[in-house]
Design a protein with these regions (language model features):
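Iron-sulfur (Fe-S) cluster-binding modules
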Residues: 1-2, 79
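Amphipathic, hydrophobic secondary-structure cores in small proteins
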Residues: 13-66
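Core SAM-dependent methyltransferase catalytic element
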Residues: 73-79
Length: 79
């Protein structure tokens, strides 16, 4: 993947368990304009497959992702 883009919004989902990171992500993306990017940070290991499935189902692509000190970081662009 390319370098991480500068996010338009940052969503802190650290400490939250499924399904809350996806619930908060869905709400955040609905409030954004097309092509804007949200950076979501989560600590629930289930976030990796959950965000991938959510991205595929909603057509909002993950443009970058990484793990830093057990924090999963996802940059998602609103379609």
């Amino acid at each position: 993947m390319a370098d991480a883009p500068t996010p338009d919004r940052i969503l802190d989902a650290k400490g939250l368990l499924c399904p809350m990171p996806i619930v908060k992500l869905s709400k955040a993306v609905k409030e954004m304009e097309s092509q804007q990017v949200v950076l979501m940070e989560a600590t629930d290991p289930g976030s990796v497959p959950d965000v991938a499935a959510w991205s595929k189902n909603t057509h909002n692509p993950i443009v970058h992702q990484e793990v830093v000190d057990k924090v999963m970081r996802f940059w998602i662009q609103k379609a």
